[in-house]
A protein has these predicted regions:
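Peri-membrane helix termini and adjoining interfacial loops of integral membrane proteins
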Residues: 1-9, 76, 127-130, 182-187
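A membrane-periplasm/extracellular boundary helix in multi-pass inner-membrane enzymes
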Residues: 67, 88-141, 151-161, 169, ...
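Hydrophobic alpha-helical transmembrane segments
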Residues: 210-224
Length: 307
């Protein structure tokens, strides 16, 4: 019996997942949609049995989510909740964009101080929740974080060498070893560079497909997010509108998680991710169709009234 030991979290999900971070990312992706059915289940006509099932399922997911010890997943779910707060506050999309730009400028000007604070943090990953959260910003001694920075540095060097078209789709895994620098290596680095990916959904296309790949990949995420918010605001049905919002929240968890890890090449993340993307787009198309139908009906009424 391992109980809830921290070290056991790294392989307790096997054979279904090969990594606890992928497991955490998948749960984070699903929690908002399941929460939707808990909140709006009665409006959807769910009986007592269905509601008990939803509550049980959500409780299991949250328990697994916490015990996954995936720091990136924890951060991503907080970001999704932030989206819910902002949307429910009825803040205009333009305002959000301006605020985001201002934050980017502030971070850019404060980058030296931020990195200095991160470098002073020596708290490693731990079974203690508070210490584990604190280790998120440890870029000096935490092996996982240091190795992540190593992979990112390799990706950026590969991009600098081939900025337009990159080194080719799927080639990062086979080539990054040659781009490793001794001062970037961690205790879990390998000389041959045979252990994986960029740890980023944004830097992988940048290194493999150049600037075009990064822009294309990011555009898909941004457009889907905008469509999700638009679907929420233009859909007349409260239930459909909130389904679009909670599906967008689920996707947001991975948009954020994608800065720190990269799992879309696996079926276990790709299926729920693109499934939620399809839900968001379908609701937006439905809302567009309803709007056009309403316009036609109004035109007919005007013509009839003129007669």
């Amino acid at each position: 019996s391992h109980g809830f030991a921290f070290n056991f979290a790294h392989y307790s999900m096997q054979p279904f997942y090969n990594d606890h971070t992928a497991y955490g990312a998948a749960i984070a992706l699903l929690i908002p949609p399941i929460a939707y059915y808990l909140i709006y289940g009665k409006d959807l006509g769910f009986g007592k049995g269905k509601m008990i099932f939803v509550i049980t399922l959500l409780a299991i997911l949250i328990t697994g989510f916490v015990l996954s010890y995936s720091r990136a997943a924890w951060v991503s779910l907080c970001a999704a909740f932030g989206v819910w707060v902002l949307v429910k506050s009825n803040i205009k999309l333009k305002t959000l964009i301006y605020c985001g730009l201002v934050m980017c400028v502030v971070v850019a000007f404060s980058w030296g101080r931020i990195m200095g604070a991160f470098e002073k943090n020596d708290q490693d990953s731990s079974g203690n929740m508070a210490e584990h959260i604190s280790s998120i910003t440890n870029i000096s001694t935490d092996a996982s974080n240091v190795e992540r920075l190593n992979r990112w540095a390799c990706a950026l060097d590969m991009f600098k060498e081939r900025p337009v078209f990159g080194c080719g789709p799927g080639m990062y895994t086979f080539l990054y070893g040659a781009y490793q620098k001794s001062y970037n290596l961690s205790i879990i680095s390998t000389d041959s560079g045979d252990l994986g990916s960029t740890h980023s959904e944004y830097l992988r296309p940048l290194s493999e497909q150049g600037l075009i790949g990064l822009l294309t990949n990011t555009a898909v995420f941004v457009v889907t997010f905008v469509i999700g918010i638009r679907a929420y605001r233009r859909t007349a049905s409260k239930l459909l509108a909130n389904l679009a919002l909670f599906a967008t929240m689920g996707l947001t968890t991975y948009y954020v998680h994608g800065f720190l890890n990269q799992f879309l090449e696996t079926d276990k993340l790709a299926v729920p991710f693109w499934g939620l993307t399809a839900v968001v787009v379908a609701i937006d198309l439905y809302a567009t169709k309803k709007e056009k139908q309403a316009e036609k009906d109004n035109e007919k009424q005007l013509l009839n009234s003129e007669k």
